[in-house]
């Protein structure tokens, strides 16, 4: 009986394939339009940047907040990429999206930008006008 059961199971079981087929996560073509970067509460480390000015460029937009431990772990890497790849055309924009009221003052964002020595423009997004469309 065990042999008959085994044979029956083998007949109904789909063959197992060890071949891996990779699928793209997203379309390789750029999206049609970058959401607006307006609506922040000021800019640190430079003048306001518009989506139109970034058209055709390789852009990394880093959403972070200064009191987030995960953000604190990634900021040095983003900073290093900004420095390392700037000459090759990478543009980094920081969007500070506060979680708590004490993270909202522009002076707090400026202190964090100085502490982490961020060389790229950062816009505080206290009302989530910038981050929401993303």
Feature locations, PLM:
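N-terminal "domain-start" segment that seeds a small globular fold
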Residues: 1, 7-52
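Structural signal for short hydrophobic segments within the conserved structured cores
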Residues: 35, 120-121
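Sec/Tat-exported extracytoplasmic proteins
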Residues: 38-41, 58, 67, 82-85
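Short active-site neighborhood of thiol/selenol oxidoreductases, capturing the structured segment around
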Residues: 48-72, 78, 92-95
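Short conserved loop adjoining the S-adenosyl-L-methionine
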Residues: 51, 130-133
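Active-site acidic short loop of glycosyltransferases
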Residues: 55-57, 87, 118
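Structural microenvironment flanking redox-active thiols in thiol-disulfide oxidoreductases
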Residues: 72-116, 124-131
